[in-house]
């Protein structure tokens, strides 16, 4: 993740005192589909592929699984990349979790991450 994104989230945690960070994917995600197919896309969109590849590799070709795995991976990456986020999570002052929004049902399915010790 780029420093500007992490810094924005750290601000929410350290300054605003937010209690939950939710990394949310969504069903039928075009970026996940494109990464799975290694399709050609305009501009710099393909730069996202490298961040999606760990999830794609573990998805067995299933887009729903890739989307959920990616959301979990990105949430775990947040905790690993930021001492502010990691320390707040360890102190049980912050819950970092992942989920997938289903466009058809308009429901979110959460995918819990273990607490840090």
Segments and roles (model prediction):
Residues 1-19, 30-117:
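Divalent-metal-activated hydrolytic enzyme cores
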Residues 23:
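Conserved functional hotspot residues or short segments at active or partner-binding sites
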Residues 26-27:
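Active-site cofactor/cluster-binding pocket
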């Amino acid at each position: 993740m780029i420093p500007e994104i992490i810094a924005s989230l750290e601000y929410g945690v350290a300054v605003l005192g937010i209690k939950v960070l939710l990394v949310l994917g969504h069903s039928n995600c075009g970026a996940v589909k494109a990464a799975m197919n290694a399709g050609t896309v305009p501009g710099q969109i393909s730069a996202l592929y490298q961040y999606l590849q760990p999830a794609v590799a573990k998805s067995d070709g299933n887009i729903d699984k890739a989307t959920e795995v990616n959301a979990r991976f990105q949430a775990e990456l947040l905790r690993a990349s930021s001492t502010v986020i990691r320390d707040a999570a360890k102190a049980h002052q912050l819950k970092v979790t992942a989920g997938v929004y289903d466009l058809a049902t308009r429901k979110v399915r959460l995918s819990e991450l273990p607490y840090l010790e």
